[in-house]
């Protein structure tokens, strides 16, 4: 698009260079982050075969603002690799609003050119560092912040409330649906999130209720920003942002809206019903809007999870890596493991780890309601409803630093993660092995533990 062309003009124009340009989208479509690998493959095959493949179906190419990058730069017909230079060089770029911003250079490997670089050796980390928590914040269910969480635990309360009326957007009025999934004639109770405040001006978001980010993204932004403000980190530092999350299942409602048009068309044809074009569009609009209103661009793009990490990093002008980690209930453990590696190698000064899960959407509830709890669990937990989970939802953030660095910087330290081990095993020995390794790292035994959460 125009912005991409102007960006290339700014970089190459100042060096009086005009590279040939191509895009793998024309062959394989829009693949989000996977497009980077497809682009690399295209470049590598092109280098090997000495042939530059075309970008297809480009009929009216645009050009950059001053015309330095013009339509002539776009390869629209296959051509042999230029022979002005003895060596072949190429580049691939992957970037987009999902947070990807990666650039890689290639040259053709040939024995006559010899080795171009020295052998690279990464420093080996003999022992993973202790991680200090220098900032922390959360919103869980009706508890808005650490103070309310502390008060709830201190008083031994169970924060179970009725499902807020606005959460299911009318689904809770469907008695037949509720009965089918075992809720009787009433919506479920749980540790539901009802509402929270957010500063749209600070987050540079449009305060339009019809075109705003989905709650999953807004909640993560708010909690992460609160935790960072507690810490001593400053804007512009080399800080990584990791968000443990899964795809918001409300996306299925959006997909259902999109698919309704095809389903209605099939149904009309099956019934032999003929409508004018105007009648058809009116019917399609009524039925689709009954499920979900048309999704504006900001709301649509916020279903892309990685934007969460990118927005946090952008807000604080951090220049470390920013991405999401999705591994269901293991997501937080994997994010902490990744943080440990980043801090151990000295790649970043600190790591922000956030986690979010909004189980209160009807899609989440109706799917997970079918998962039974064992009789033993129900017997031992008086807080659980008689035959289902006690659902809760929310988001939390911790800000991590190498303990030695945090101590040297006089950071306020909430707690220290001495050792971390995680595995995907589902049996007792697997859990026991991880626990033993964590204890052995610190030369501790089980008798040294005062609390197991």
Predicted regions and their residues:
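Condensing-enzyme catalytic core of the thiolase-fold
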Residues: 1-453
């Amino acid at each position: 698009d125009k912005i991409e062309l102007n960006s290339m003009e700014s970089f190459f124009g100042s060096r009086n260079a005009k590279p040939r340009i191509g895009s793998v989208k024309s062959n394989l479509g829009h693949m989000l982050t996977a497009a980077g690998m497809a682009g690399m493959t295209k470049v590598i095959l092109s280098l090997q075969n000495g042939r530059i493949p075309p970008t297809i179906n480009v009929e009216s190419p645009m050009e950059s603002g001053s015309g330095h990058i013009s339509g002539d730069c776009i390869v629209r017909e296959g051509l042999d690799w230029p022979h002005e230079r003895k060596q072949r060089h190429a580049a691939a770029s992957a970037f987009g609003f999902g947070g990807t911003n990666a650039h890689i250079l290639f040259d053709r490997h040939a024995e006559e050119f010899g080795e171009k670089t020295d052998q690279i050796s990464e420093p080996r980390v003999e022992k993973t560092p202790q991680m200090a928590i220098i900032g922390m914040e959360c919103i869980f269910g009706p508890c808005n912040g650490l103070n309310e969480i502390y008060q709830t635990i201190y008083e031994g309360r169970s924060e179970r409330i009725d499902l807020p009326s606005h959460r299911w957007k009318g689904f809770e009025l469907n008695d037949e649906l509720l009965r089918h999934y075992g809720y009787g004639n009433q919506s479920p109770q749980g540790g539901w999130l009802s509402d929270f405040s957010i500063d749209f001006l600070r987050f540079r978001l449009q305060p339009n209720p019809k075109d705003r980010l989905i709650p999953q993204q807004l909640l993560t932004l708010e909690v992460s920003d609160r935790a960072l403000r507690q810490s001593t980190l400053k804007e512009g530092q080399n800080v990584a942002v990791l968000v443990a999350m899964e795809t918001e299942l409300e996306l299925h409602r959006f997909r259902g809206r999109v698919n309704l048009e095809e389903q209605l068309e099939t149904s009309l044809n099956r019934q032999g019903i003929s409508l004018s074009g105007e009648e058809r569009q009116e019917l399609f609009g009524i039925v689709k809007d009954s499920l979900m209103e048309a999704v504006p661009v900001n709301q649509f793009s916020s279903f892309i999870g990685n934007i969460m990490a990118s927005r946090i990093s952008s807000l604080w002008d951090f220049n470390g890596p920013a991405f999401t980690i999705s591994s269901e209930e293991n997501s937080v453990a994997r994010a902490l493991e990744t943080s440990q590696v980043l801090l151990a190698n000295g790649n970043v000064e600190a790591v922000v780890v956030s986690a979010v899960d909004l189980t209160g959407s009807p899609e989440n509830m109706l799917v997970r309601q079918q998962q039974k709890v064992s009789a033993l669990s129900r017997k031992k937990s008086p807080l659980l409803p008689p035959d289902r989970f006690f659902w809760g939802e929310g988001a939390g953030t911790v800000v991590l630093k190498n303990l030695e660095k945090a101590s040297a910087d006089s950071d306020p330290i909430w707690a220290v993660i001495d050792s971390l081990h995680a595995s995907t095993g589902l049996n007792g020995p697997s859990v026991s092995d991880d626990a033993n390794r964590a204890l052995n790292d610190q030369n501790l035994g089980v008798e040294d533990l005062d609390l197991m959460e």
